[in-house]
Amino acid sequence: MKDLLKFLKQQNKTEEFDAIRIGLASPDMVRSWSYGEVKKPETINYRTFKPERDGLFCARIFGPVKDYECLCGKYKRLKHRGVICEKCGVEVTLTKVRRDRMGHIDLASPVAHIWFLKSLPSRIGLMLDMTLRDIERVLYFESFVVTEPGMTTLERGQLLGEEEYLDALEEHGDEFEAKMGAEAVLDLLRELDLAQLIAEMREELPTINSETKRKKITKRLKLMESFHQSGNNPEWMIMTVLPVLPPDLRPLVPLDGGRFATSDLNDLYRRVINRNNRLKRLLDLAAPDIIVRNEKRMLQEAVDALLDNGRRGRAITGSNKRPLKSLADMIKGKQGRFRQNLLGKRVDYSGRSVITVGPTLKLHQCGLPKKMALELFKPFIYGKLERRGMATTIKAAKKMVEREMPEVWDVLDEVIREHPVLLNRAPTLHRLGIQAFEPVLIEGKAIHLHPLVCAAYNADFDGDQMAVHVPLTIEAQLEARALMMSTNNILSPANGEPIIVPSQDVVLGLYYMTRDRINAKGEGAIFKDPKEAEKAYRSGNADLHAIVKVRISQSVKNENGVVEDTITVIDTTVGRAILSLILPKGMPYESINQPLGKKQISGLINECYRRLGLKDTVMFADQIMYTGFHYAMKSGVSIGIDDLVIPPVKAQIIESAEAEVTEINQQFQSGLVTAGEKYNKVIDIWSRVNENLSREMMSNLSKDTVINAQGEEVEQASFNSVFMMADSGARGSAAQIRQLAGMRGLMARPDGSIIETPITANFREGLNVLQYFISTHGARKGLADTALKTANSGYLTRRLVDVAQDLVINEDDCGTEDGLTMKPLIEGGDVVEALRERVLGRVVAEDIVIPGTNTVLVERNIMLDEKLCDLLEEHSVDEVRVRSVITCDNDFGVCANCYGRDLARGHIINAGESVGVIAAQSIGEPGTQLTMRTFHIGGAASRASAENNVQVKTNGTLKLHNAKYVLNTDGKIAIISRSTEITIIDSYGREKERYKVPYGAVLTVQDNAEVQGNDIVATWDPHSHPIVLEHKSKVSFSDIDDSNTETQTDELTGLTRIVVKDLSKANAKEPKLIIESEERGLQETRLPSFTTIEVVDGTTVNPGDVLARIPQEGSKTRDITGGLPRVADLFEARKPKEPAILAEVTGTISFGKETKGKKRLVITPDEGDHYEEMIPKWRQLNVFEGERVSKGEVIADGPESPHDILRLRGVTHVANYIVNEVQEVYRLQGVKINDKHIETIIRQMLRKCTIMHGGDTDFLAGEQIEVARVNIANRDLEAQGKIPAKFEIQLMGITKASLATESFISAASFQETTRVLTDAAVNGKSDELRGLKENVIVGRLIPAGTGFSYHQERMARRKQRNVVEEQTVSAEEATQALTDALNADLSGNQ
């Protein structure tokens, strides 16, 4: 019998498959799947509850209802397996076959498949070159279509109404054929000769000039080719046989009380069968045409509803007015098959409970309630009890566990030992949301969680719940221990910094114990070692904060990695000496010889990890936590109302501000300032007051004045509780203390605008009713925002994961020499991100040399770690070319060198790591911290935009970049280019500051001059845009008269100026200046509305002089989109509303003939055709007639469109743009994300390209294809010496990129399921199952992480299999083996 079971198991082995293909099913294929035709709409007999014969649940077709038992009960038991009962016709087999045996319905009249008809673009319509409207009229029996014109004047595919048809019949008789309904469409599709049509269209394409026609033909050609190549037949889009789903997948379940719950599909099938049978009868009876037609139409509608209810017309509803769920609804949406059952499954062996603090746990432990553990580990306990002989059977073991006998607890202890469990807190936003711990049994019902992992889980103990899962198999336990254990996840995968960081109480305790206090007990003592200091503290002879000397022996690794022991006497405090007792060997004492705030502790753990490795760090982190909790308790830091000290100058500050505001209000009433100016000024005043007040308050709080041992007055940091909490980073911030002890400040309305009356009171003084009302007004918006934000952030994460899920490290080095150039990010006078932060953990793309020499500092292909980064800083290197994911040459993944360091582990990344998902999670997880608001610029922000000079902060050399300039009459530099930047270089050649300088700015110093800090080096007028002369020229006026200009006289100086009127109102000519110079000849400059002319007609003007000034208003008051919506816009690659206009080619600017409301901009390159573009007149251009621009330069200001940047400046520029813009949003919120995560997403956005020219490939011009596929095809062609295809890389938004992925399974499970599947079926697509998602859906290990090697082995096996024939068992051999086994067994048991 054992052999028999072995044999059965062998037969049940799943096939290894490498791809899944989807296509159209031919009628023959549907019949081959089927086990019989369903002829009746009956389901089951309501008395016997047995399935009706030939009905929707028929046992003869679909299989028996009970295992190994036929319907009438003649054959029962296993011995009759395979017998077909002659009485009821049922095969004796497992009832499980009712899940996979299909039936079919022979349709009396063909029916169009609604997906290929209505899913846009309509495939049937494209095939026949008819509009959807026309085809629907034929299908739903409204008009005839000519299927065979014969010798008549009619055309094939022509539509005829009822009247026209009768007329044509009279005229031509039987010479032509016209039909209606799906039969007609079927005939038309049959007639198509694909090969011939394709050849004709390929010939016709090059001759077509009209763009729309070419697009249409290309579309049709692509569809025909995909049908031709995939072996699909167009006529299969019309169904003549309808498959019937196996009955157990659309069950009929008896409820109590004799009623039945049924799947909606049964109703839909019954409807189809009823109508089909009725149609058959009508056809047999030869009923009148109009009745038959109506019945056929109803059949078509019934099948439509079965396949996709509601796609056409009103959805068919059931008895309860709810639309029935059709086959299409089963698979799409959040509740569909993909997202509900395949990608998100429920798990057994899990429990959930509230969490509470476990301050005594070690980092790898969690407290598990006994009751919960008993339930979760039941099977293990049963097995152990039985093996021990404590229970004879499983049933007995069950009883023991239910009674909770004492032995059970001992067994539970053993079972749990070394068996990790997974803890998960929803929402799981990144991979640290699930970690493994060793359970420790505890009394009570709450799970105990180690405080240090709270940051990773984003958990707090205000009622959060967590789920526990038990890994069952030995492989799962191994992975949990080796990869998911909390001790292995010390660094955050998003930025490589420690995520196991103390917070709140622990920070406060450590901060308190490392502070120093003047005049503390025991000051000036000297201790022989930290232990003695601790003894003094314990015995009460020395205070924790006393400044003392301690002899410290430390062993620190030097440069060569040798451990040296040193003994020194160090000035420190008692508390720090005590803390040094838990400092691991090899860490320098300096690292704790300072007051430790949150930042310092984080740095301490980071340094420990880099110096000493994982094990020491974990133990140190635990010790830090215990110590921190202990001393937080000792400190007795608490908060009382007297700790909130209100600065005495508050009343005076507010009084003076109110006086200023009153003055502005008076000015407003006398009409000196506008309402807008008044609003901005008032808000400016209050913002300034708020800042001053909070500065006063903090300085008041943070310092105490004491008299030291020498009798002098000195200041020391305060021991005020509130200040200590904020200063240490434990809780609270200056902004919150300001509201408690300063003033509440300005409040926002729900629409984000600021209310101009501030709340001058603080919370200690208390608010009056009006103030309270103002503060609630904006606060409610905050709550509504949070809910919105969470949903939006979740959706962004989902889209990111979807686009990046199949990006996996799949080789060590792709060998590319390409990369990105990294420089420090400098904005104004501040280094926003230093070079070391940008290149740490990256692989060098080309040798780094010491600046100014040829000495190689770091060779290419070496990863920059902390030591090498220190080296770069020593030699003041400020530009490094590093490898990047974006430039990686790998076709279907990324190589380890282009990715660099695995941030969560600190070494170069392993093969098989799924970097795409990590990137998506790292960007999506902090999404909830971003704001949702679009900022309205006003007040302080508008003040910043009115900068009018550059004031440098440091000493150094001034350098100009991309500058075109002329020297004016004073010999100063006047800038005449757009994208000029000034940088300040220090004595080592490092860039320290970088400023943008506008057109028309005047420099006060020359290029390469030495400048001092606080020097003003450039000035300009912020309110107007000057037109500056390049050469000495004669200027004359043209079209300037009273109709379009007016003369204004300045009252103070008495000077008169000519100002252009508003040209958009009157139909005036546009005034021009004619400029005549030796260098350029005649040029004309047009003057827009409101321009002030600064010169007199007919005078000669020097270079650098200003001809005219164009006012700069209006463009500055745009809203800035910030926060989450901005990030989403960038990743969706959306075009901005009014994008900047960039120069398409390099050349000279001129203006052509104008049209109504548009200017014609012409750029003439040195050779080749000129380029023209129409630009709205109101757009302010940055260029003038005759100016040279280079390709990609900004012509009109505005937000730049990433598509333009890619097209005109290339891949690296667009990558830099998106990275910097995304980082700016996150930086504002203080979130650190490594650049390479954003680059990873950008790589996925750039994976498609448009074919410009097909070369010798099969690609059509204008086709969109994966870059990888084009590269592979081109490599093959180049090897054969043929012409490769030319292509242009496209930037795609993440949603579009996810839907355009090669894998149709992945795309279908993301969005627009119907469209994706229709498309894939028509193209006969194969899914190679490369990504993670597809493999999860088909239920395999994913090709990443530990599954990576499994898939590599599978591929290797497949290669072998192509050589060696696999051993298979034929049906005859199988039956023989079975009979032998059964006979042997029977004879043995006699």
UniProtKB/Swiss-Prot annotation:
Which residues of the sequence carry a binding annotation for Mg(2+)? Answer: 460, 462, 464
Cofactor field: Mg(2+); Zn(2+)
Q: What class of enzyme is it?
A: transferase
Q: Name one Pfam family in it.
A: RNA_pol_Rpb1_5
Q: Which reaction does it catalyse?
A: RNA(n) + a ribonucleoside 5'-triphosphate = RNA(n+1) + diphosphate
Which keywords fit this entry according to its UniProt record?
A: DNA-directed RNA polymerase, Magnesium, Metal-binding, Nucleotidyltransferase, Transcription, Transferase, Zinc
Q: Which SUPFAM superfamilies match?
A: beta and beta-prime subunits of DNA dependent RNA-polymerase (SSF64484)
Q: Which domain of life is it from?
A: Bacteria
Q: Which residues bind Zn(2+) 2?
A: 814, 888, 895, 898
Q: Which GO terms describe its cellular component?
A: DNA-directed RNA polymerase complex
Q: Which GO terms describe its molecular function?
A: DNA binding; DNA-directed RNA polymerase activity; magnesium ion binding; zinc ion binding
Cofactor binding note: Binds 1 Mg(2+) ion per subunit. Binds 2 Zn(2+) ions per subunit.
Its assembly, as annotated, is: The RNAP catalytic core consists of 2 alpha, 1 beta, 1 beta' and 1 omega subunit. When a sigma factor is associated with the core the holoenzyme is formed, which can initiate transcription.
Sum up the protein's function in the record's words: DNA-dependent RNA polymerase catalyzes the transcription of DNA into RNA using the four ribonucleoside triphosphates as substrates.
Q: Kindly provide the name given to this protein in its UniProt entry.
A: DNA-directed RNA polymerase subunit beta'
